[in-house]
């Protein structure tokens, strides 16, 4: 289940960060379908996945607040943005943000789009640091386009006319989403970068939601075109060929791979300025500038 994968990712994040898990103020789990048991398509979100993760971790502190975030594929980035807001407001010093999904239990086997869907989870600790340290989130940008694009991604019937079950499956208007993404995401990245006061030449990596390699290529190319610049080599790490599209989990799992030098010619070092960007159901778009 998604909550199991979220727990495994959370354990690793807590271990890597060397924090005391009882000191966490918030656990935020971004997902879209909750836990979905085998042989059924029923979505289970009661209790929240965040509460289930807290229970599995064995955290006893009642002041560790848990909630789920339903925001489409950009959910993990939005969770990080919310965690930063809590810290800035003095409501938290440490937050655990997880993106987890089991799309293998929600897709239509008769839909060719389903072959790229996968399961996964990625977790991060967002922690308050000294203002003197020039690291962390520099800027962010979020938009929801719900006038004409609300139902570009939706739950619908199987493409198999002989499928008479009442189950609903992930469906999308693929071409419409593609055109939307390659327009809105590059602009969000640009707006976000300009808010950070960093130059386009400072950007070392761009981490995009792994929905479609062709679409991600187009988004990055258009982003650099906004600056009348060619796209730098190795600027965009990719994992979809290996891990598929796990929705909210694609960016945190991709970040983990690059951070641990698991992708050829892709690495990060202290001081690097990186961009995150995602697009998904809503339709939601967000971006974040971060300094390692």
Could you say what each language-model-derived stretch is?
Residues 33, 102, 129-130, 141-147, ...:
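Glycine-rich beta-alpha junction loops
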Residues 30, 70, 95-101, 126, ...:
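Short beta-strand segments
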Residues 88-121:
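Flexible, glycine-rich active-site loops centered on histidine and acidic residues
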Residues 31-34, 57-69, 104-108, 230-238:
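Glycine/charged-rich beta-loop-alpha catalytic/anionic-binding loops adjacent to active sites
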Residues 1-32, 36, 157-204, 215-219, ...:
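Conserved active-site "lid/cap" helical segment
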Residues 7-10, 36-43, 47, 68-88, ...:
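Claisen-condensing/thiolase-fold acyl-transfer catalytic domains that form or cleave C-C bonds
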Residues 20-26, 62-65, 93-94, 199-204, ...:
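Short acidic capping loops at alpha-helix termini that bridge into adjacent secondary structure
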Residues 1, 110-183, 187, 279, ...:
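Condensing-enzyme catalytic core mediating Claisen C-C bond formation in acyl metabolism
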């Amino acid at each position: 289940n998604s909550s199991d994968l979220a727990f495994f990712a959370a354990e690793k994040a807590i271990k890597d960060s060397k924090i005391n898990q009882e000191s966490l103020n918030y656990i935020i789990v971004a997902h879209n379908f909750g836990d979905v048991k085998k042989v059924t398509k029923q979505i289970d979100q009661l209790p929240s996945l965040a509460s289930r993760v807290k229970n599995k971790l064995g955290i006893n502190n009642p002041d560790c607040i848990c909630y789920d975030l339903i925001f489409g594929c950009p959910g993990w980035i939005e969770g990080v943005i919310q965690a930063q807001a809590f810290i800035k407001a003095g409501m938290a010093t440490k937050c655990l943000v997880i993106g987890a999904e089991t799309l293998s239990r929600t897709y239509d086997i008769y839909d060719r789009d389903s072959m790229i869907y996968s399961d996964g989870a990625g977790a991060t600790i967002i922690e308050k640091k000294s203002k003197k340290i020039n690291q962390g989130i520099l800027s962010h940008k979020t938009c929801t386009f719900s006038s004409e694009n609300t139902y570009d991604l939706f739950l619908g019937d199987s493409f198999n006319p002989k499928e008479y079950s009442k189950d609903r499956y992930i469906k999308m208007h693929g071409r419409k989403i593609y055109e939307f993404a390659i327009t809105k995401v590059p602009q969000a990245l640009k707006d976000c970068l300009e808010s950070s006061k960093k130059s386009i030449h400072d950007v070392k990596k761009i981490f995009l939601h792994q929905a479609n390699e062709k679409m991600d290529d187009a988004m990055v190319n258009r982003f650099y075109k906004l600056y009348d610049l060619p796209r730098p080599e190795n600027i965009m790490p990719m994992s979809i060929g290996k891990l598929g599209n796990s929705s909210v989990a694609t960016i945190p799992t991709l970040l983990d791979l690059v951070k641990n030098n698991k992708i050829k010619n892709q690495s990060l070092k202290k001081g690097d300025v990186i961009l995150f960007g995602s697009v998904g159901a809503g339709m939601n778009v967000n971006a974040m500038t971060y300094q390692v």
